[in-house]
Amino acid sequence: MEMKRTIATAILVAVLAISCLSRNPTIEAYRNHFYSINFMDVETLSVKLTTEQIDISRNEKRMLKDGDILVYLTDEDRLGKMVILELDKNESGMLLFDFVTYDKDGKVFIEKKDVKFNSSYVFDFDKGIFPKEIEGVKLWWHSIDDIEMYLVPWAPTKLLKYPNAEMN
């Protein structure tokens, strides 16, 4: 009887350990901060949005890191936010992010998690897709070469790094 209890305890401990390892506490912290930012916060920053590209090069010029949050305005005049979960980890050429696009009343229009945005692709925040056609594109990951890269909002889309979004 004691042996069965010991084995059951060992199995329970192993299952709990595996469960804890499967969750990334850093990503959860990024998401918690991301979801603490509401539509009013995004709307307040909307006057500062710009069409300037954001440097994500593989050097000291990089302006973004994991956990950073961007606020955006789409070409369909919707505000939104995105959180960077992983940016070019191990030089993968991939950006992993979550995003929320709001309608004009501040209600969630579209929301997706764990979006994998590859280098040289474009993304549409109004539809939550990587469009086949360039028309209506919202954000482009522009790779000049293996080092120099930018996130480029295509006008009239605008972007802004959320202030004090550092989580690292």
Tell what function each PLM region has.
Residues I7-A8, Y72:
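Generic detector of short alpha-helix boundary/capping microenvironments
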Residues M1-T6:
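Positively charged n-region of N-terminal signal peptides that target proteins for export
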Residues A8-A17:
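Hydrophobic helical h-region of N-terminal Sec-dependent signal peptides
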Residues C20-N168:
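Surface-exposed, beta-sheet-biased, low-hydrophobicity segments with strongly acidic/polar composition
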